[in-house]
């Protein structure tokens, strides 16, 4: 099967190609990238006016499978990923039961293989049952295909156990994906601690909840030599510490989510639990630091922290509702609208942060690139097409987004995974 993508603006961070060209895919590999390819193909896609990028890689997704499949499952999550231009995703292990052994990891892997839409990589939990007490079978899970370990949803508060996990990760050459949150300081907080939390009469979450664990994790990573990836950074000091750590030669990377670079606590509509996520929406000053950090490549990655819940679960008070919003189907549009169109990052940086850099961090040698011989994972995006975000269009089970009704630019037109068209905008 040959697919020829014609006349698109090809953006490849691997080769630094940034021009109008054609891309020829044959079976599951990229065959050729150059101007005016004449070869016959089974399918020709006219990408005039569109970006043609390596398939996006989302390092931070909650598929809720097994055990929480009323919120999402491997199939619906994969469909949402494909609609969002994501051809590879990392699923977090905070499921029910927790993915803390090779057998449970294989369950997700097998389900994703049967689904056969996008590449689903399952991260393994750092500790058994995510209780923070005993290490999981990290080596067994890595042998079974885990690209990384994480305790996402919480931090491992026992620093010695965490250090031992980092030592294993360093030996196995896998990253640790860190959710930085000192649970002892949260105190039932449900939004950022600022004048808005006071106004709403809600308990707040201060920046130090994140910052103290960012500092700890960076220092343990320095000591162990493991690669630390900071998930969903939200504070100005996380940007400072990440920058200083990189200057110090520590192997560390960081991600920002679209909701944190788009919104602040000033945007929260009182009582609307679609604005409740963890870490919370911070201040304008914090958001500004995230934008500067994205622009200056302090932050390597844009991920979604896609966290679906049912409307019933979210339809309670701000204090009682679960944290989290969906993001797979809106991340491209928000990145183009809020970052590319406003001059914070270039289209090339977008491709780096949403594909090339995640591939490097996760050691996915054949992903994140449009070089001939690499995997035929490609996304075609119309950066100029405007539309209004509407949860009725979502294929995810989760409709919990604060972006309902927002007018955005940038639409995924075609997603190709392994040389197969897995999504097409009709």
List PLM regions with ranges.
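Alpha-helix-loop-beta-strand connector modules within alpha/beta enzyme cores
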Residues: 102-119, 167-178, 330, 334
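Metal-associated gating/positioning segment near the N- to mid-region
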Residues: 47-112
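His/Asp/Glu-enriched, well-ordered alpha-helical/loop segment
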Residues: 199-227, 274, 295-296, 300-301, ...
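Histidine-rich, glycine-flanked metal-binding segment
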Residues: 1-55
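Active-site mouth loops of central-metabolism enzymes
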Residues: 59-72, 95, 121-134, 203-207
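Histidine/acidic residue-rich metal-binding segments in metalloenzymes
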Residues: 135-302
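Divalent metal-coordination and catalytic microenvironments
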Residues: 8, 23, 28, 49, ...
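C-terminal cap of metal-dependent C-N hydrolases
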Residues: 8, 317-320, 341, 372-426
């Amino acid at each position: 099967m040959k697919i020829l993508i014609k006349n698109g603006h090809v953006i490849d961070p691997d080769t630094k190609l940034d021009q109008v060209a054609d891309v020829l895919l044959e079976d599951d590999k990229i065959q050729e990238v150059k101007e005016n390819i004449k070869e016959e193909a089974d399918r020709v896609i006219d990408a005039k006016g569109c970006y043609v990028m390596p398939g996006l890689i989302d390092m931070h997704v909650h598929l809720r499978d097994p055990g929480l499949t009323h919120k999402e499952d491997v199939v619906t999550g994969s469909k949402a990923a494909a609609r969002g231009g994501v051809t590879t995703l990392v699923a977090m292990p905070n499921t029910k039961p927790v993915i803390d052994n090779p057998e449970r990891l294989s369950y997700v892997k097998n389900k994703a293989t049967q689904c056969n839409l996008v590449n689903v990589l399952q991260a393994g939990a750092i500790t058994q049952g995510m209780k923070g007490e005993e290490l999981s079978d990290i080596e067994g899970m890595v042998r079974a295909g885990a690209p990384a370990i994480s305790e996402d949803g919480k931090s491992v508060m026992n620093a010695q156990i965490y250090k031992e996990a980092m030592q294993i990760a360093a030996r196995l050459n896998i990253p640790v994906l860190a959710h930085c949150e000192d649970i002892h300081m949260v105190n039932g907080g449900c939004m950022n601690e600022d004048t808005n939390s006071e106004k709403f009469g809600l308990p707040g979450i201060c920046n130090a909840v994140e910052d103290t664990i960012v500092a700890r994790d960076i220092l343990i990573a320095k000591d162990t030599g493991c690669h630390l990836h900071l998930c969903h950074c939200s504070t100005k000091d996380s940007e400072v510490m990440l920058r200083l750590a990189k200057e110090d030669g520590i192997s560390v990377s960081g991600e920002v989510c679209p909701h944190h670079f788009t919104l602040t606590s000033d945007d929260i509509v009182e009582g609307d639990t679609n604005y409740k996520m963890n870490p919370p929406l911070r201040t304008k000053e914090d958001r500004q630091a995230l934008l500067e950090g994205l622009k200056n490549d302090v932050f390597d990655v844009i991920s979604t922290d896609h966290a679906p819940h049912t409307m019933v679960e979210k339809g309670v008070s701000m204090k009682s509702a679960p944290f989290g919003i969906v993001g797979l189907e809106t991340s491209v549009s928000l990145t183009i609208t809020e970052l590319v169109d406003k001059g914070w990052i270039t289209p090339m940086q977008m491709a780096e942060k949403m594909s090339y850099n995640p591939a490097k961090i996760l050691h996915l040698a054949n992903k994140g690139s449009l070089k001939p011989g690499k995997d035929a994972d490609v996304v075609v995006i119309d950066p100029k097409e405007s539309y209004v975000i509407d949860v009725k269009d979502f294929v995810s089970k989760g409709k919990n987004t604060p972006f309902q009704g927002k007018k955005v630019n940038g639409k995924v037109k075609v997603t190709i995974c392994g040389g197969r068209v897995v999504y097409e905008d009709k």
